[in-house]
Amino acid sequence: MEQTWRWYGPNDPVSLDDIRQAGATGVVTALHHIPNGVVWPVSEIKQRQAELAAKNLVWSVVESVPIHEDIKTHSGNYQQYIENYQQTLRNIAECGIDTVCYNFMPILDWTRTDLEYELPDGSKALRFDQIAFAAFELHILKRPGASNDYTAEEQVQAEAYFNAMTEADIAKLTGNIIAGLPGAEEGYTLDQFRARLAEYDGIDKAQLRENMAYFLRAIIPVAEQVGLRMAVHPDDPPRPILGLPRIVSTIEDMQWLKETVDSIHNGFTMCTGSYGVRADNDLVKMIETFGDRIHFTHLRSTCREGNPKTFHEGGHLQGDVDMYSVVKAILTEEQRRQSLGDMRPIPMRPDHGHQMLDDLHKKTNPGYSAIGRLKGLAEVRGVELALKRTFFPELKQ
């Protein structure tokens, strides 16, 4: 696997020097300063590449080229935004980058309710609390019909949770959910968020699938022409939230995506932390079934709690993800590719990490502190090395 590291650009508290010292050789980044829907100029892409090259690093994967909401709703200026997206892909390929990660989650990117959940050892993790989220939907956002998405017991618990909140608690929870986490290019006020939600009235799972299919039929031929591997990231969490459909959550969704545009360039980001939230997602089976379409991996683990929809992020070798078996399956796919002459290792990044040690006293991007990810990368690297020595001696060390 190619060891990579996500970097949010010059304003990221984690520097390129830090990344190099972590042992990563590739960087996963994007042009975060360019608004959604605007073409990425070749000059801007090359400038970012030069910044990385100055530190002996390469831009391995683009994460992400955000998809404008007009494309997801198939409304407004969606056709122009698709054409802009196509041109951005051409420009990325012109600069020699061959992998693009993206997602098709409506409105929000990945979602958490607590960005500072304290673990027994004193480190901090990200957490999604189903009851806190219900309290937000039912009593803060006051989304019409939200009660239909929660059990009677969850509604009682949510009301008690809300009644115990201070104004500061309400503001913090609201900000955590709608203000935009790292990688999400847009944040909202409550009124703006309600207006965005209204744009999805009448868009169910079938319609969102059709909108995504239209997008894929437009951009995958471009990816084929220029040699780009598109790698869709799963929904996080992998289920409908806020009354919005989500369509990249299960192995059935992966099969639908494959069949919709059956091209090797129409592939997946295997995010074990996103898919792994669902107990019914067999991660190894997913890798074995769609191995040739997995162009990028995010390796992390989560811990499901008493309410199966509540989870927090565990250590990379802990929690509900069997990282040993996952890495073994990825290496098996790499071995298959190398036997066919494809020597490019699958890019992997240690996704998220606990805020720990000295990082507890620093300003960090939630989930993207340096030391927690350094620990995760070292752990995954150790698993990979042990597996290669034991089972895959022919793979490039």
Curated annotation (Swiss-Prot):
Q: What EC numbers are recorded for this enzyme? A: 4.2.1.8
Q: In which pathway does it act?
A: Carbohydrate metabolism; pentose and glucuronate interconversion
- For this UniProt record, give its keywords in alphabetical order, as a comma-separated list: Iron, Lyase, Manganese
For molecular function, the Gene Ontology terms on record are: ferrous iron binding; manganese ion binding; mannonate dehydratase activity
Reaction catalysed by this chain? D-mannonate = 2-dehydro-3-deoxy-D-gluconate + H2O
In terms of InterPro entries, this protein maps to: Man_deHydtase, Xyl_isomerase-like_sf
* Enzyme superclass (EC): lyase
Q: Which domain of life is it from?
A: Bacteria
Enumerate the cofactors the protein uses: Fe(2+); Mn(2+)
UniProt similarity note: Belongs to the mannonate dehydratase family.
Query: What is this protein for, i.e. what is its function?
Result: Catalyzes the dehydration of D-mannonate.
Specify the protein name.
Mannonate dehydratase
> Which species does the entry assign this protein to?
Yersinia pestis
Name the lineage: Bacteria, Pseudomonadati, Pseudomonadota, Gammaproteobacteria, Enterobacterales
